[in-house]
C-alpha cells in the first residue's frame, strides 16, 4: 500500500506535518509539499504549472492524507487551489479505490471552521470516488485514526 501526505502548509516541518506524522506513525509514506509546486488559481495557466505532477502523485497512491493549517477560518490557499483545479481536469470517480484522510489544525479553530473544512474534504472524496477515512485536528484524533489505516 502506498501512502501520500499532501502537505498544504508553507512550513514543511510545522504543526500540520507533525499531525500527519502522528496519523501515519509506523507507516512508510511519501510527502508532497504543495509549496514546492507552482499552483495557480482555477482558470490560470502559469509557466511551470505543477498541478499535473500533484494529480499524478495522488493517482499513484492508495491512501492520501491531505493536510492543511486553518487559515482565515478555512482550508489554506494551496489546498483550496488543488481542490478547485481538480474540477474539469480529473473525471468524477477519477481517484476511485483510494482512501482519503484529512489533518486540519490551527491555533484555536472554532467548531464550525473544522466542520466546514471536513465538509469540503468529504465532498472532494465523494466526487472523485475515494473512501473518506476521517479528520484529525489533534494528536489524540490522529492516533485513533492511525488504527484505521
Task: Give residue spans per PLM region.
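Rossmann-like dinucleotide/flavin-binding elements
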Residues: 109-110
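Rossmann-like NAD(P)(H) cofactor-binding subdomain of soluble oxidoreductases
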Residues: 113
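Short, conserved loop/helix-junction motifs that constitute active-site signature segments
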Residues: 91-97
Amino acid at each position: 500500500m502506498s501512502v501520500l501526505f499532501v502537505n498544504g502548509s508553507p512550513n514543511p516541518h510545522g504543526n500540520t506535518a507533525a499531525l500527519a506524522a502522528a496519523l501515519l506513525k509506523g507507516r512508510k509514506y511519501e510527502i508532497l509539499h504543495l509549496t514546492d509546486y507552482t499552483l495557480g488559481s482555477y482558470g490560470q495557466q502559469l509557466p511551470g504549472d505543477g498541478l499535473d505532477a500533484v494529480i499524478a502523485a495522488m493517482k499513484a497512491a492508495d491512501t492520501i492524507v491531505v493536510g492543511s493549517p486553518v487559515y482565515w477560518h478555512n482550508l489554506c490557499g494551496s489546498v483550496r487551489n488543488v481542490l478547485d483545479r481538480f474540477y474539469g481536469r480529473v473525471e468524477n470517480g477519477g481517484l476511485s479505490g483510494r482512501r482519503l484522510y484529512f489533518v486540519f489544525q490551527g491555533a484555536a479553530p472554532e467548531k464550525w471552521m473544522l466542520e466546514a473544512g471536513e465538509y469540503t474534504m468529504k465532498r472532494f472524496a465523494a466526487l472523485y470516488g475515494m473512501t473518506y477515512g476521517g479528520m484529525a485536528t489533534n494528536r489524540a484524533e490522529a492516533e485513533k485514526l492511525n488504527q484505521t489505516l
